[in-house]
């Protein structure tokens, strides 16, 4: 077709020749993460303390707040479909990936991300970008999972077609390249939001937990493999709520079950360095007295 496919996104399996169809006789394996070709190298951003801040935005008191708070880490939302286009709009940056050109709103990037990241980089703050995909705009429509329920604010990326997979990979490659700049740095990436609550947040329909995790793990691996071409110190984080042994909401998954599947998939398909980004909320979100939580037990 028109796409130049990067085998960094591929996995391989062993098949046995059959009379009518070939038979799968092994787990699929992804590329060895230690052998990913480095297009560039940057220094790690060390954590200086455990103090951090969530949800950075560009505002008039940003530099004052960063200086006064003395944080070492922070997060920033990266809503891909807000600034990515499939056809050129005025002021867009043209970016070619896999033989196809995609378009990114430069002014949005500057005002929403660049200005903030320049300030955090000057202060040695380790920033994690939270990858979010709202099913809006032409890029969001292409990236929308085919079983998205039409209600949740975000969709699981659609990795069921070459066109949509390449679009998602192009967004990841663009962001990884742009923000592996030491003067404008995103050090780590959080993959979507509260995936144990996929029914309400990162949605791909009502799926068995193993099916959901198989898809989510592909998104994590794509990000990890692409980013590590530009920043070998970067980690990808799985985003959880506070429902570890008990689901945090109706129709949600248990975090512990998801972690067990992460380990099983990684063992079978090739391990990589994933990390946890959990929301340490109380059982009742409106009551911060965690010592009163009856369900907060040592049960892991």
How would you label these PLM feature ranges?
Residues 72-248, 283:
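Substrate-binding cleft and catalytic face of glycoside hydrolase catalytic domains
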Residues 260-300:
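Glycoside hydrolase catalytic-domain groove-lining segments
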Residues 66-67, 121, 269:
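Non-catalytic positions within long, well-ordered alpha-helices that form the structural scaffold/packing
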Residues 6-23:
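Short, aromatic- and glycine-rich surface loops/edge beta-strands on solvent-exposed regions
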Residues 1-4:
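Aromatic sugar-binding surface patches on proteins
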Residues 9, 25-81:
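Boundary/entry segment of secreted carbohydrate-active catalytic domains
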Residues 55-68, 168-178, 252-265:
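Short, acidic/polar
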Residues 236-277:
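Substrate-binding cleft/loops of secretory-pathway carbohydrate-active enzymes
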């Amino acid at each position: 077709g028109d796409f130049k496919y990067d085998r960094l996104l591929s996995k391989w399996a062993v098949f046995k020749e059959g009379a009518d169809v070939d038979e799968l006789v092994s787990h699929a394996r992804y590329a060895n993460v230690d052998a990913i070709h480095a297009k560039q190298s940057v220094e790690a951003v060390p954590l200086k303390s455990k103090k951090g801040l969530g949800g950075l935005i560009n505002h008039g008191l940003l530099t004052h707040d960063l200086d006064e708070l003395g944080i070492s880490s922070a997060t920033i939302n990266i809503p891909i479909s807000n600034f990515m286009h499939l056809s050129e709009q005025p002021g867009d940056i043209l970016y070619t990936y896999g033989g196809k050109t995609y378009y990114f709103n430069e002014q949005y990037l500057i005002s929403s991300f660049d200005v903030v990241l320049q300030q955090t980089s000057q202060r040695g703050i380790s920033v994690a970008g939270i990858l979010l995909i709202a099913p809006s705009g032409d890029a969001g429509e292409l990236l929308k999972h085919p079983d998205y329920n039409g209600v949740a604010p975000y969709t699981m990326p659609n990795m069921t077609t070459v066109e949509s997979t390449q679009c998602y990979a192009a967004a990841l490659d663009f962001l990884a390249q742009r923000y592996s700049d030491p003067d404008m740095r995103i050090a780590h990436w959080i993959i979507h939001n509260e995936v144990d609550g996929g029914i309400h947040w990162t949605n791909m329909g009502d799926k068995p937990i193993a099916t959901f995790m198989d898809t989510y793990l592909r998104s994590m691996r794509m990000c990890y493999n692409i980013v590590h071409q530009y920043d070998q110190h970067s980690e990808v984080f799985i985003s959880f709520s506070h429902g570890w042994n008990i689901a945090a909401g109706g129709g949600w998954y248990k975090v512990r079950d998801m972690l067990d599947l992460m380990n099983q998939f990684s063992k079978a398909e090739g391990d990589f360095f994933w990390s946890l980004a959990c929301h340490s909320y109380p059982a009742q979100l409106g009551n911060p007295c965690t010592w009163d939580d009856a369900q907060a037990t040592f049960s892991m």
